[in-house]
Curated annotation (Swiss-Prot):
One of its GO terms (biological process) is GTP biosynthetic process. The keyword NAD does not apply. Homotetramer. This is Nucleoside diphosphate kinase. The lineage of its organism: Bacteria, Pseudomonadati, Pseudomonadota, Gammaproteobacteria, Vibrionales. It comes from Vibrio parahaemolyticus serotype O3:K6 (strain RIMD 2210633). It catalyses: a 2'-deoxyribonucleoside 5'-diphosphate + ATP = a 2'-deoxyribonucleoside 5'-triphosphate + ADP; a ribonucleoside 5'-diphosphate + ATP = a ribonucleoside 5'-triphosphate + ADP. Pfam families: NDK. It comes from the Bacteria. Belongs to the NDK family. Disulfide bonds: none annotated. Coiled coil: none annotated. The keyword ATP-binding applies. Keywords: ATP-binding, Cytoplasm, Kinase, Magnesium, Metal-binding, Nucleotide metabolism, Nucleotide-binding, Phosphoprotein, Transferase.
Amino acid sequence: MALERTFSIVKPDAVERNLIGEIYNRIEKAGLRIIAAKMVHLTEEQASGFYAEHEGKEFFQPLKEFMTSGPIMVQVLEGENAIARYRELMGKTNPEEAAAGTLRADYALSMRHNSVHGSDSPESAAREIEFFFPESEICPR
């Protein structure tokens, strides 16, 4: 097993409903460590930069509007096979298809308002972590 890092977002719908602590608890119970975290309210420019790979897709503008609608929590998670483990904890993007007991099955309101984001590959994890966190803000433990 490989020790790796992944990137996670607690999205505006979950922050608004005061689910940060519950989600963090579930992350830690899954054996992942939170090694960096902060609350931010994305600007449109930041959202455009973060989601640049989706520019031109039909959901790009609604996604940006949602992700700038309120504060989010961004965090770096570390653990054995962190990317796969966190994606399993999140569940499928569509909460109706997410397995019982996953974050999206338990907390998501819809496909768009699905409470959490997690990196899907080591490459995206590295890019997403770097977007929000300089190495000096990451505290391995």
